[in-house]
Amino acid sequence: MNQTENKPKNYTGIVLTLTVLINGLIAVLFFMPKLDQFSHANIHILPMLNAIFNSFTFIFLLAALIMIKQKNIKAHKRFILAAFTTTLLFLICYVTYHSIAENTLYGGEGIMRPIYFFILITHICLSAIIVPLALFTLIRGFSMQVERHKKIARWTMPLWLYVSLTGVIVYLMISPYY
């Protein structure tokens, strides 16, 4: 058997391309004109769906963490795939909503205003970072690069948990202003 058969495939190009496409699409959504042909549709349920998807992502990630601590790799993988699924559903709803609806401005005052913006800004920044981290972590786990997977997962898991939880918090804080 030659060495190229044992060497894991390099998915860096795919991960970086997906990262640029996903983060680029989300950035463009805030500057592009909204799609008028759907203005009659009741899309205000989509932010709540996003919060629900984020909630499930958070729960699935916690379950995956518990499963791996218990050395239940099979269940860990299933919960991670469930988290990726709810994250993908979130992304579809998020892009749909923000391609149609105008941005909602936060109307809170006092101490809640800086708290909201701190949570929002950290959520946005870490959301962009979590895209490649989650993809690389998934690839390393499923390609059985166990040590490399563990090394990156120590960063990915807490950041992804934070992003999914703060997504729900941001929704709860801004929902009165929809």
Swiss-Prot record:
Alphabetic keyword roster: Cell membrane, Membrane, Transmembrane, Transmembrane helix
Ion transport found in the keyword field: no
Transmembrane segments: 13-33, 48-68, 80-100, 115-135, 155-175
GO annotation, cellular component aspect: plasma membrane
Compartment(s): Cell membrane
InterPro entries membership: DUF420 (IPR007352)
Protein name: Uncharacterized membrane protein YozB
Gene: yozB
